[in-house]
Amino acid sequence: MPGVLTAAIPALPALLLGFFLMQTGNTFQGTILSIRGEIEGFTLAQIGAVGAGFWAGVIIGSLRAAGVIRRVGHIRTFASFGAIAGAAPLVHLLVIDPYVWIAARALTGFCFAAMFIVIESWLNAGASSENRGQILSIYGMTGLLAGIGGQLLLPTTDPAGFRPFCIIACIISLALAPIALTQGAAPAPPGEGSHVSLGRLYRESPLGVAAGFLGGVTTGAFFTLGPIFAEMRGLSMGEIAIFMACGTLGGFVAAWPLGLLSDRWDRRLVIIGAAAAAAASLTTMLALAPGDAYPWLLYLCVALFGGMIIPTYSLALAHLSDAVSQEEMVAASGGLLLAHGAGAAAGPLIAGFAMSATPRGLSYTLVAAQVLIVLFGVRRFFSRAAAPVAHKSAFAVEPPVPVGTEFAIAHSTPA
C-alpha cells in the first residue's frame, strides 16, 4: 500500500481489513440465506423479502448512525454494532421462520450501515483533495474483492447445516479486531449536513436518479435471487459460487474502463451502453443457455452482466456530480443513495413475485430494469445537452453496498 496514503490515514490498513472481513461475511450471508431459505421451504417471494429486509435496514441505519457516532465516537459505534451484526446470523439458525429472517436481515443491514459509515467517515476525514479519489477507489475495489471471496466460501460447507452461520458470525466478529485495536486516533464525529430533496435531484439530473434507482433494483434482485436462479439451472453448490463470483468479478474488471470512458465521453452514453450490454447478456443467456448448458457459458454471460450493472451506481453518482455544485455534492450524494437503497429493497420483492409466476421471472425483472435505463437515457440524451468537460468530476469506484457517509450526514437524525 502506498506509504503516502498510510501517512495520511495511519489506520488505513486496519480500516480496509475490517471492511474486507465485513463484506466477505455479508456476501456469504446473503447467498447462504437464499439457498437455505429454499431448503427450508420458503416461497420465492419470502426469500426476496429477506433480501429486501437488508436494504430496508441499511436505509434506516443510515438515518440514525451519524447521530450515534456524534454521541459515542467512531470506535465504540463500530464495536457495538459489529457485535450485534456478528450475533444476527445465529438468529437465522435458531429460528427458521421467514418473518424472523426478514427482521434479522433488517437488523444486519442497520448494523452494517453504521459500520460502513464509521469506516467511510474515517477515510474521508483523513483524505485530502489530492488523494481522496484514490483512497475511495481502493476502498471500493476492496469491497468488490471481498464480495468475490464471500461467494467462493459457499462450497466449503453444507448450506443445510449449522456451520455456514457460525462461519459468517466468526468472520463478522473478526472484523472488529483491526479497528478496535488500531493505535491511530479516530477522527472528530461528523457534523450536521444540509438536505437536498429527491424531487430537486431529479430535476437537476433525471438520468442520474433513475439509473441509481433502477441500478439498485437490478443489483438487489440479482444478489438475492441469483443463487436460486443458478440452482434452478442445475448448478452444484461449487458452480453456484463461481456463478455469483463471476458477476462480482465482472464488476471488478469493468469498473475502471467504464469510468475512464465516462470521464472522456458523455456519461449518458456510457450509462445507456452499459445498460444495453447488460440486457443483451441476459437475453443471450436465456436464448443460448438452457438448463443443460455448459456452466462456462453461464459464467461468461453473468460476468458481462455484472460488469455492466455493478458500476451503474458509480456512473450515476459521477453524472449527478456534473449537475450540482461542489457545495451541494454531499447532500446530493445522500439523495442518490436513498434512491439506490429504495431500488435495492424493491428489486428482490419484485423479482421474488415474478419468479413465483414464472421460472424466468428474475431474468425478466433484470432485463426490464436495464431496458428502462436505456429508454429513459435515450430520451434524456436528446432533450438535454451534455455537461461541459470542464464541469465533469472524476470517476471513483464505489463499494458493493454504497450507503455511507454522504447519506448519513445529509439525512441524519439525532440519536
Positions of predicted regions on the chain:
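C-terminal membrane-cytosol helix-exit motif in multi-pass small-molecule transporters
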Residues: L154-P155, A169-P190, V374-S383
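Cytoplasmic helix-loop-helix junction between adjacent transmembrane helices
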Residues: A106-M141
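Intrinsic disorder in cytosolic terminal tails and internal cytosolic loops
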Residues: M1-A7, P187-L198, R380-A415
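Intracellular juxtamembrane helix-capping segments at the cytosolic ends
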Residues: A114-A127, I310-V324
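Paired small-residue
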Residues: Y99-L107, W296-L304
